[in-house]
């Protein structure tokens, strides 16, 4: 794949603009919102193709994410989500990431992206046309596991926590849907596209276009929320057979959409990226070095060498772990609220979660079309980086506080791990936990897409290009999965202790988060200091090695 600004024969009849002239053209508009859509005329086809790839992938992931959650909540136990994330998603992700890293040693990111899109197109078609339609024939009977654990037969033996695990295998087709959707999000949306775009675009193009990619993806996230909202309403009208038929068809359509995405990518490579769009006047000095892989052991070695990397890892781990803990508690609350309101769990869950997607999609798109998207350049890196820890702190107070109050009051007879006597005997407030909780969970996702991701990419661009891929593999690739798994392991611990609802430990979880928040904020302040030093000296960011050396081994 040719880089946009590479030296290729130029058509003398159509003089090319220089990179500076393209930048000036892209930034020439002064009327909002055109002033925020900073794309030059010669870049529109390229931007449109990349935006379609990212937007379509984001739509597929956001819709299938709602579907996978509603499947698990309706056919399994809420705690099963934690087991799936830790015991299935994490190890499979590590294996797949290792395979990807091995492939990248001998193949380009473009080729690996091709393989990934083809594989997921096949998997989604398989889900929609085979696994779900024939689920009753290829998996154990519906009541196989439920009969084993009926009437608390296993409770007195201390094996009640195994119910969730039995259901995961009993309903293995829905478990497969969950794992497949999670992998699609982490591989295609969060890693492959961004890596492909970084190769296709110059740094200055990336700075302008990346916020716009997130605008498009969040507009489609808004469309996804409307789709899931419409679906949840229709489920109440359709009979079981029609519901299954339409639900299965969604995944078949997604498989076809991924195939179209692959074709658009090939079009961009074969017709747009092979042509020179402008004459580069600013390049990135690339040091020569061996192409490195970053497996788990290599990642740990890297982290042990650099204080900077430790801070980046903490920043990622705390965000993903906090999001997982808060969202798990919130989704458990949704499941309990559905019972309290005598509503079908899948429809109730889809209606609530689609509301969350609606808020996130609209607000992120608006925020990224305002000067907020350039806060790093205008007001400093910390103005964006500090938002996620503050939003997560507020969300933890609301979600864990309401979960603590509601858990001990519905259903009757339940008591939380500690302090249940303080709130026992009151009427549960599911409106606060579920409906107001939407805004807390939405706030954390807005903080990620509009603040965390932008600030992370900004500081990543200051890392020496020789080390950047290795370091990003740690805090971008590995830590997202580890952070989610930490939250899931926490929920699993309480399940083993006899609490299948993580909300039972809400006061303990809140106390832990009040300790973690200051540490997270301190790590952001440290990273801001390193970023500012790099900008002021116009040099790669100081990795601040524990050994005092200047270079990684």
From Swiss-Prot:
<keyword id="KW-0067">ATP-binding</keyword>
<dbReference type="GO" id="GO:0005471">
    <property type="term" value="F:ATP:ADP antiporter activity"/>
</dbReference>
<feature type="transmembrane region" description="Helical">
    <location>
        <begin position="210"/>
        <end position="230"/>
    </location>
</feature>
<feature type="transmembrane region" description="Helical">
    <location>
        <begin position="362"/>
        <end position="382"/>
    </location>
</feature>
<feature type="transmembrane region" description="Helical">
    <location>
        <begin position="385"/>
        <end position="405"/>
    </location>
</feature>
<dbReference type="Pfam" id="PF03219">
    <property type="entry name" value="TLC"/>
</dbReference>
<feature type="transmembrane region" description="Helical">
    <location>
        <begin position="477"/>
        <end position="499"/>
    </location>
</feature>
<feature type="glycosylation site" description="N-linked (GlcNAc...) asparagine">
    <location>
        <position position="27"/>
    </location>
</feature>
<keyword id="KW-0472">Membrane</keyword>
<feature type="glycosylation site" description="N-linked (GlcNAc...) asparagine">
    <location>
        <position position="406"/>
    </location>
</feature>
<comment type="similarity">
    <text>Belongs to the ADP/ATP translocase tlc family.</text>
</comment>
<keyword id="KW-0813">Transport</keyword>
<feature type="transmembrane region" description="Helical">
    <location>
        <begin position="44"/>
        <end position="64"/>
    </location>
</feature>
<dbReference type="GO" id="GO:0005524">
    <property type="term" value="F:ATP binding"/>
</dbReference>
<feature type="transmembrane region" description="Helical">
    <location>
        <begin position="176"/>
        <end position="196"/>
    </location>
</feature>
<feature type="transmembrane region" description="Helical">
    <location>
        <begin position="244"/>
        <end position="264"/>
    </location>
</feature>
<feature type="glycosylation site" description="N-linked (GlcNAc...) asparagine">
    <location>
        <position position="532"/>
    </location>
</feature>
<feature type="transmembrane region" description="Helical">
    <location>
        <begin position="79"/>
        <end position="99"/>
    </location>
</feature>
<feature type="transmembrane region" description="Helical">
    <location>
        <begin position="154"/>
        <end position="174"/>
    </location>
</feature>
<keyword id="KW-0547">Nucleotide-binding</keyword>
<dbReference type="GO" id="GO:0005886">
    <property type="term" value="C:plasma membrane"/>
</dbReference>
<comment type="function">
    <text>ATP transporter involved in the uptake of ATP from the host cell cytoplasm. Provides the microsporidian cell with host ATP in exchange for ADP. This is an obligate exchange system. This energy acquiring activity is an important component of microsporidian parasitism.</text>
</comment>
<keyword id="KW-0325">Glycoprotein</keyword>
<dbReference type="InterPro" id="IPR004667">
    <property type="entry name" value="ADP_ATP_car_bac_type"/>
</dbReference>
<protein>
    <recommendedName>
        <fullName>ADP,ATP carrier protein 2</fullName>
    </recommendedName>
</protein>
<keyword id="KW-1133">Transmembrane helix</keyword>
<feature type="transmembrane region" description="Helical">
    <location>
        <begin position="115"/>
        <end position="135"/>
    </location>
</feature>
<feature type="transmembrane region" description="Helical">
    <location>
        <begin position="308"/>
        <end position="328"/>
    </location>
</feature>
<keyword id="KW-1003">Cell membrane</keyword>
<keyword id="KW-0812">Transmembrane</keyword>
<feature type="transmembrane region" description="Helical">
    <location>
        <begin position="507"/>
        <end position="527"/>
    </location>
</feature>
């Amino acid at each position: 794949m040719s880089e946009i600004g590479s030296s290729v024969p130029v058509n003398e009849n159509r003089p090319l603009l220089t990179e500076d002239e393209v930048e000036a053209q892209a930034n020439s508009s002064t009327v909002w919102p055109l002033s925020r859509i900073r794309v030059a005329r010669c870049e529109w086809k390229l931007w449109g193709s990349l935006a379609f790839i990212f937007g379509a992938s984001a739509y597929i992931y956001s819709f299938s994410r709602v579907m996978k959650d509603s499947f698990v909540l309706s056919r399994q136990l809420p705690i099963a989500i934690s087991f799936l994330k830790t015991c299935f998603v994490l190890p499979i992700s590590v294996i797949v990431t290792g395979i990807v890293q091995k492939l990248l040693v001998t193949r380009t990111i473009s080729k690996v992206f091709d393989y990934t899109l083809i594989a997921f197109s096949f998997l989604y078609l398989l889900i929609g046309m085979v696994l779900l339609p024939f689920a009753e024939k290829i998996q154990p009977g519906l009541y196989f596991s439920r009969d084993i654990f009926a009437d608390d037969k296993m409770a007195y033996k201390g094996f009640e926590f195994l119910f969730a695990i039995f259901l995961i295998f009993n309903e293995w087709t829905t478990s497969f849907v969950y794992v497949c959707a999670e992998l699609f999000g982490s591989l295609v949306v969060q890693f492959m596209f961004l890596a492909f775009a970084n190769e296709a675009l110059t740094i200055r193009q990336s700075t302008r276009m990346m916020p716009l990619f997130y605008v498009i993806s969040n507009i489609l996230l808004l469309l996804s929320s409307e789709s899931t909202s419409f679906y949840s309403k229709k489920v109440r009208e359709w009979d079981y057979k029609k519901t299954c038929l339409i639900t299965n068809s969604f995944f078949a359509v997604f498989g076809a959409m991924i195939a179209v995405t692959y074709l658009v990518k090939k079009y961009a490579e074969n017709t747009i990226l092979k042509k020179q769009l402008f004459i580069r006047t600013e390049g990135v000095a690339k040091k020569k070095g061996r192409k490195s892989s970053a497996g788990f052991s290599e990642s740990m070695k890297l982290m042990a060498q650099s204080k900077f990397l430790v801070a980046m890892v903490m920043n990622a781990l705390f965000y993903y772990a906090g999001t997982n803990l808060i969202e798990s508690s919130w989704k458990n609350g949704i499941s309990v609220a559905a019972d309290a309101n005598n509503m079908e769990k899948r429809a109730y869950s889809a209606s609530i979660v689609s509301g969350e997607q609606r808020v996130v999609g609209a607000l992120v798109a608006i925020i990224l079309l305002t000067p907020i998207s350039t806060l790093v350049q205008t007001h400093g890196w910390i103005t964006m980086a500090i938002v996620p820890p503050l939003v997560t702190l507020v969300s933890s107070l609301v979600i864990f506080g309401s979960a603590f109050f509601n858990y001990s009051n519905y259903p009757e007879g339940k008591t939380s791990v500690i302090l249940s006597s303080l709130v026992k005997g009151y009427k549960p407030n599911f409106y606060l936990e579920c409906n107001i909780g939407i805004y807390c969970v939405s706030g954390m996702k807005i903080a990620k897409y509009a603040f965390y991701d932008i600030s992370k990419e900004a500081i990543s661009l200051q890392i020496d290009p020789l080390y950047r891929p290795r370091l990003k593999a740690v805090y971008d690739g590995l830590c997202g999965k580890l952070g989610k798994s930490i939250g899931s392991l926490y929920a699993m611990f309480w399940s083993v202790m006899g609490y299948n609802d993580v909300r039972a430990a809400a006061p303990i979880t809140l106390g832990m988060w009040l300790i973690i928040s200051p540490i997270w904020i301190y790590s952001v302040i440290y990273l801001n200091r390193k970023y500012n030093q790099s900008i002021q000296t116009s040099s790669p960011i100081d990795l601040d090695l524990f050994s005092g050396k200047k270079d990684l081994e």
